């Protein structure tokens, strides 16, 4: 796997949004699933967080993920810091500005997936966002595997 930072360890991927209560939580959960399915636990580290974390993961997101047999009911949004991101090879933002997230001089790669916030959306709309995130996470892991 390609590392953009000076780290010689695993490739580190951070999934970040403002509240860490929806999109980034779904991306993190799907990425954990990909790690296990592809046997990459020793090669990839995952991180998720928000710049202004909410108190809880959005109920609609918990339900949408449960529909795919992934339980995130026990997840708690957390704050992401510049220090967290400094060692990340990839910072995947969900529609927020990377300039507010990524530290100055950071050597990694930012990708903004520009996804709609699922908070307050209908179950069908949340499912559509969830499915798009699942697809993008799978594509990211396909790409990472080709660089090994």
PLM feature spans:
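Phosphate-binding/catalytic loops
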Residues: 90, 96-148
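Polar low-complexity intrinsically disordered regions
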Residues: 1-8, 89, 99-100
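Conserved active-site segments centered on acidic
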Residues: 2-81
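Alpha-helix C-terminal capping/helix-to-coil transition sites in glycosyltransferase folds
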Residues: 85-87
